[in-house]
Every structure is written in C-alpha cells, then in structure tokens.
Amino acid sequence: MAAGSITTLPALSGDGGGGGAFPPGHFKDPKRLYCKNGGFFLRIHPDGRVDGIREKSDPNIKLQLQAEERGVVSIKGVCANRYLAMKEDGRLLALKYVTEECFFFERLESNNYNTYRSRKYSNWYVALKRTGQYKLGSKTGPGQKAILFLPMSAKS
C-alpha cells in the first residue's frame, strides 16, 4: 500500500445495507427482562399466563428475543415455548404461534431501559404493575416506570 492510500473493506453480505443493524434473527443469548417498576422479571407461563416475579432463578423468565425486522421483535418464553402477545383489549398473554399481536417495537430509551410497544396497537406498551401483574396496554404510556425493562443475560 502506498502512503496516503485508502483501503476499503467489502460489506458483509446479506446485511441489506443496514448500517450496522442486526439482520433479522434471534439474539444469541436468552434474556431476562427486568422491569423498573417493582423489580420484577417478565414471566411467561406454559399455560399462557404472563406476570412478573422477583425470583431470578424461575425458569419461566428466560426469554428469547427474535428480531423480525429493524426495530421489531417477538418475545418467546424459552421454557413455555410461547410468544408474548397483546390482545385488542390490552391483555398480555402468551400464544403457541406467532401472530400480528406478537410483534413489538423495541426502543432503547435515554435512561438505558428498553420499551416494548405493540406494533398492532401502536400506543400500548408491555408493562408490569408494582404488584407483579401485567398492566393493560390501554393504561400504559410514555414516561411510566411500568413500561421500562432492562434486558439482562439469562445464561445459567
């Protein structure tokens, strides 16, 4: 190489020119989603119920976040083998199969917590009350502690 010359590296194939964005697919390691409101981990039960628990050894808090497209994820309970969904009445539950109600816009907020806003019901967020129960989507909004989640490693 001559002095002052510039070398360019080839772009990664299949990145769609996304400027460093992850291609669609799962994030390698399972996560636990820690809610700022009450210190609960989001839990998906095998029977489809959704709530929060403080016990970090509960196997039902291990979640797989799947990138569906840029900024959109689905959230699957690893042990429950079910997908988090928000219904038209704002309830959270877990389904055996992915539907349009299972896609959430994931956003990193300025306080370094993530929010998960329903793609289908666009003003509603995944949220946990201080009691550990889920909060109806229709009762959620920006600025609430209940919608703030910190993704943490769930490696055993």
From Swiss-Prot:
Region (Heparin-binding): 129-145
Subcellular location: Secreted; Nucleus
Keyword S-adenosyl-L-methionine: no
Database matches in InterPro entries: Fibroblast_GF_fam, IL1/FGF
Cross-link (Glycyl lysine isopeptide (Lys-Gly) (interchain with G-Cter in SUMO1)): K96
Source taxon at top rank: Eukaryota
Keyword Secreted: yes
Positions where Phosphotyrosine occurs in the chain: Y83
One GO MF term: heparin binding
GO biological process: branching involved in ureteric bud morphogenesis; canonical Wnt signaling pathway; cell migration involved in sprouting angiogenesis; cerebellar granule cell precursor proliferation; chondroblast differentiation; corticotropin hormone secreting cell differentiation; endothelial cell proliferation; ERK1 and ERK2 cascade
One cellular component (GO) term of this entry: cytoplasm
Positions with a binding annotation for heparin: N37
Alphabetical list of Pfam families matching this protein: FGF
Protein keywords: Angiogenesis, Developmental protein, Differentiation, Growth factor, Heparin-binding, Isopeptide bond, Mitogen, Nucleus, Phosphoprotein, Secreted, Ubl conjugation
Propeptide residues per the UniProt entry: 1-9
The record's account of how the chain is modified after translation: Phosphorylation at Tyr-83 regulates FGF2 unconventional secretion.
Site, as annotated: Important for interaction with integrin: K129, R130, K135
Similarity annotation: Belongs to the heparin-binding growth factors family.
Record note on quaternary structure: Monomer. Homodimer. Interacts with FGFR1, FGFR2, FGFR3 and FGFR4. Affinity between fibroblast growth factors (FGFs) and their receptors is increased by heparan sulfate glycosaminoglycans that function as coreceptors. Interacts with CSPG4, FGFBP1 and TEC. Found in a complex with FGFBP1, FGF1 and FGF2. Interacts with FGFBP3. Interacts with integrin ITGAV:ITGB3; the interaction is required for FGF2 signaling. Interacts with SNORC (via the extracellular domain). Interacts with glypican GPC3.
Purpose: Acts as a ligand for FGFR1, FGFR2, FGFR3 and FGFR4. Also acts as an integrin ligand which is required for FGF2 signaling. Binds to integrin ITGAV:ITGB3. Plays an important role in the regulation of cell survival, cell division, cell differentiation and cell migration. Functions as a potent mitogen in vitro. Can induce angiogenesis. Mediates phosphorylation of ERK1/2 and thereby promotes retinal lens fiber differentiation.
Protein name: Fibroblast growth factor 2
Species of the source: Monodelphis domestica
